[in-house]
Design a protein with these regions (language model features):
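Bacterial N-terminal signal peptides that target proteins for export
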Residues: 1-10
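Bacterial N-terminal signal peptides
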Residues: 10-19
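Sec/Tat signal peptide C-region and signal peptidase I cleavage site
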Residues: 20-26
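Auxiliary tRNA-acceptor-end handling modules of aminoacyl-tRNA synthetases
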Residues: 27-252
Length: 252
């Protein structure tokens, strides 16, 4: 009788323990599943929420404007593609016009590529020198690649993913409003060596086309001539052009 009672107690204890483990496992699985689903929903909702309240321009990149903030929506198909930045003067004050700087003058060109990094949740921007190239499969191709690497000039946090993950949203204000010089280094390029006053500068507008993006900006600085400080505001146009997948034949 005592042995039977002991066996019954052991069996009941084992049953309770098994039930507890099963409940804990199930709770943990549902918790992980819930977190995963919440994460996806949050990401999708952020994209949908942002696009819903934005003024959108269709083109090479979709441009979304939310009040004073500007976003590029970059498709995966455009990651790692060759792009050319062309910066031109669109309007100058008297002092610079008198010194020979006129509307229409180009002052900075740059080749860039966008690279999506889902591990660090960033989009990197690199530049390189096109004068150094080698045919793919050539015996020295690897050596050339190692000795003439692309340089990173900018990074953008990924603000949101498109629901099917085929595109990302990045906020691009900083490279056009004078905060950073990576896309538009106006005053160094025209040999003034001055810094942009961000609080007195702004993005004038953006337009999207099938093969390019156009950005207008008003960049202000202040230079000192003798005892006099002179404020200067220059209107610039930045054109980001999609280059052919097969590089064009060089002239030389």
């Amino acid at each position: 009788m005592m042995k039977t009672r002991t066996n019954l107690i052991v069996a009941l204890f084992a049953l309770c323990f098994t039930g507890t483990v099963s409940d804990a496992y199930a709770w943990g699985w549902h918790k992980r599943k819930s977190v995963k689903n919440d994460s996806v929903v949050t990401s999708e909702s952020k994209y949908d929420e942002l696009v819903k309240k934005a003024k959108t321009r269709e083109g090479m990149f979709r441009i979304h404007q939310v009040e004073k903030d500007w976003y590029f929506e970059i498709d995966d198909s455009l990651m790692n593609r060759d792009l050319l930045i062309v910066n031109k003067v669109s309007g100058v004050p008297y002092q610079l016009n008198d010194a020979g700087l006129n509307k229409g003058m180009a002052y900075e060109d740059k080749l860039i590529r966008f690279h999506k990094d889902t591990v660090l949740n960033k989009v990197w921007v690199t530049t390189w020198n096109p004068r150094v190239s080698v045919p793919e499969g050539d015996a020295i191709a690897l050596s050339v690649k190692d000795n003439y690497r692309e340089a990173v000039i900018e990074q953008f946090p990924i603000e949101a993913f498109k629901s099917d993950s085929s595109a990302v949203l990045i906020k691009v204000n900083k490279v056009f409003d004078g905060s950073e010089k990576s896309f538009n280094d106006l005053y160094n390029s025209i040999s003034l060596g001055a810094s942009v006053k961000k609080e007195l500068s702004r993005i004038g507008g953006m337009k999207a086309f099938p093969q390019n993006i156009v950005v207008k900006a008003f960049l202000t600085t202040q230079i000192t001539e003798g005892t006099e400080s002179v404020p200067l505001t220059v209107e610039t146009t930045t054109n980001i052009v999609l280059l052919p997948k097969v590089p064009m034949t060089p002239r030389f």
